A protein has these predicted regions:
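Acceptor-substrate binding/catalytic loop of class I
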Residues: 142, 146-149, 181-194
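Class I SAM-dependent methyltransferase SAM/SAH-binding core
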Residues: 49-51, 55-98
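Conserved class I S-adenosyl-L-methionine
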Residues: 1-44, 57-61, 78-81, 85, 137-176
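Short alpha-helix
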Residues: 187-210
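A short SAM/SAH-binding and catalytic strip from SAM-dependent methyltransferases
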Residues: 108-121
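A short glycine-rich, Lys/Arg-flanked "PGG" loop and its adjoining helix->strand segment in the class I
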Residues: 122-137
Length: 243
């Protein structure tokens, strides 16, 4: 996770909770999208930066893709958890908006479901641009802004998706989920797609690929079936615009 102030405080408080939640196989949405995410990133080589690595599961995926991975997160407890699991090749405690690396250090940067926890997204994206090499790629996953503002009207797989409040504006969200004996307290920022695109424009990053992935529900919990009708995530690839 990555951010400052309220975001670091939140993730520091629930670091152990998140580590248990994220590492339970097939427990949350990540597992239903993992194969598609691996294919979207693609096999590669060189230096990869996992921005807001959390407990390290995306770092481990990047290693599976063939990269040498540097994992960063502003929450020391999460960096420790990632390191204990051997998730990456190098680890640093750092926020997305203040990366301790030289210019043009990485071939790939990934921010997986991190930008919702960043208070200053434009500053974070400008930092990522700075540390990417000119030929580098930036992979972003966010909770789909549309999914963020609505909810399903019931628990059944075909329950209608309802949007009752405005899609626009920036809002703080907080909520608790309990599943299979595990509890997770989520918090972050909800904002429309335009906010992310404006931040990319200001960082002079151009989107080259966009996906609204569909979950693999073949062996996952039935609660994921509904997300085959409404996109839960939005994935982007961005490249540097020449200055």
């Amino acid at each position: 996770m990555s951010g400052k102030g309220v975001d670091i405080e939140h993730w520091s408080r629930i670091a152990a909770e998140w580590t248990a939640w994220a590492r339970a196989p097939n427990h949350d949405a990540f597992w239903a999208y993992r194969a598609s995410l691996l294919a979207f990133i693609g096999q590669g080589a060189g230096e990869a930066l996992d921005v807001g690595c959390g407990e390290g599961r995306v770092s481990r995926l990047l290693k599976d893709c063939g990269y040498r991975v540097t994992a960063v997160d502003p929450v020391s407890q999460l960096i420790s958890a990632a390191e204990r699991a051997g998730s990456a090749d190098a680890y640093m405690i750092a926020a997305a908006a203040d990366l301790p690396f030289k210019n043009c250090s990485f071939d790939l940067a990934v921010a997986y479901n991190v930008l919702m926890d960043v208070e200053d997204i434009p500053a974070a994206l400008k930092e990522v641009r700075r540390v990417l090499r000119p030929s580098g790629t930036f992979v972003i996953s966010i909770v789909h802004p549309f999914a963020d503002r609505g909810h399903f009207a019931g628990t059944e797989a075909n329950a209608p998706f309802v949007l009752q409040r405005s899609y626009f504006g920036r809002e703080r969200f907080e909520g608790t989920e309990v599943r299979n004996g595990l509890q997770m307290d989520f918090a972050g920022w909800s904002q429309p797609l335009e906010s992310y695109m404006t931040a990319l424009e200001s960082a002079q990053l151009v989107v080259t690929s966009l996906r609204e992935p569909v979950p693999d529900t073949s062996d996952k919990a039935s609660y994921m079936e509904r997300w085959s009708r409404v996109p839960l995530f939005l994935w982007l690839k961005a490249r540097l615009l020449p200055i």
